[in-house]
Amino acid sequence: MSTYLIGDIHGCYHELQSLLDQVQFNPETDQLWLTGDLVARGPDSLEVLRFVRALGNCVRLVLGNHDLHLLAVYAGIGRNKTKDRLSDLLEADDVDELINWLRRQPLIQVDEEKKLVMAHAGITPQWDIATAQACAREVEAVLGSDTYPLFLNAMYGDMPNSWSPELGGLARLRFSTNALTRMRYCFPNGQLDMIAKEPPDSAPPPLKPWFDIPGPVSRDYTIVFGHWASLEGKGTPEGIVGLDTGCCWGGNLSMLRWEDKQMFIQPSRREKQL
């Protein structure tokens, strides 16, 4: 049995299949961790969702910001942008089943035996592991409820950008969602910056990548994340693994085998755009 962790798929179904073929992935014995953003930008979001859902219990995934945006579009809240290439999915006969499955997926995965944590954007240095899990569960509970469109309608926005246990209501849910699915940079005190997207060597001071600010989780766990394609999987400290290598932008789809830390890559079918 092996555990494989794959970065943002973004509708790149054929690259996903080729990557799994490289290691002869066996859903009966192997486990597959996915960093989120299964959909959007790539050509085959529908096929990706159908495939991942059909894999069943061998998959441990987390939701990404593009997955959440899909839920909002489905609910009539977000805008279906042409560049996201979601129309085939939204018009599919099984879209209701796929959406109801997707919105019940977690925002964080933790394996205490492996001391492994996965979240789409990472873990804010303002949280310990218990807080990260509790905040993720709160968002998951709302997404899994019948009132999830009310949350999605209030999800968009950059504030609040600093964690406090006293945060409540939609503000608390928005902070947690941003920290788990959108974060890239933080101020030295751990406050989130939701504007900067450039590579770290071009970031305006005093901003730092979240993973360069020590926190309780990064001290005790390996953190695996996606979301930040321009990193190209490079530049993170030991114990922090970025797996989004921009497949939908003409980069690669990357996969880590946990047991021996071997990396596998599958080049994109598209020309490089990064």
Swiss-Prot record:
Q: What is the lineage of its organism?
A: Bacteria, Pseudomonadati, Pseudomonadota, Gammaproteobacteria, Enterobacterales
- InterPro entries this protein is in? ApaH, Calcineurin-like_PHP_ApaH, Metallo-depent_PP-like
One term of GO molecular function: bis(5'-nucleosyl)-tetraphosphatase (symmetrical) activity
Catalytic function, reaction form:
P(1),P(4)-bis(5'-adenosyl) tetraphosphate + H2O = 2 ADP + 2 H(+)
What Enzyme Commission number does this protein have? 3.6.1.41
Give the function comment from the record.
Answer: Hydrolyzes diadenosine 5',5'''-P1,P4-tetraphosphate to yield ADP.
Q: Which family does it belong to?
A: Belongs to the Ap4A hydrolase family.
Q: What class of enzyme is it?
A: hydrolase
Which superkingdom is the protein from?
Bacteria
Name of the protein this chain belongs to: Bis(5'-nucleosyl)-tetraphosphatase, symmetrical
Please name one Pfam family that this protein belongs to.
Metallophos
**Species:** Erwinia tasmaniensis (strain DSM 17950 / CFBP 7177 / CIP 109463 / NCPPB 4357 / Et1/99)
Could you list this entry's UniProt keywords, alphabetically sorted. Hydrolase
Keyword flag Hydrolase: yes
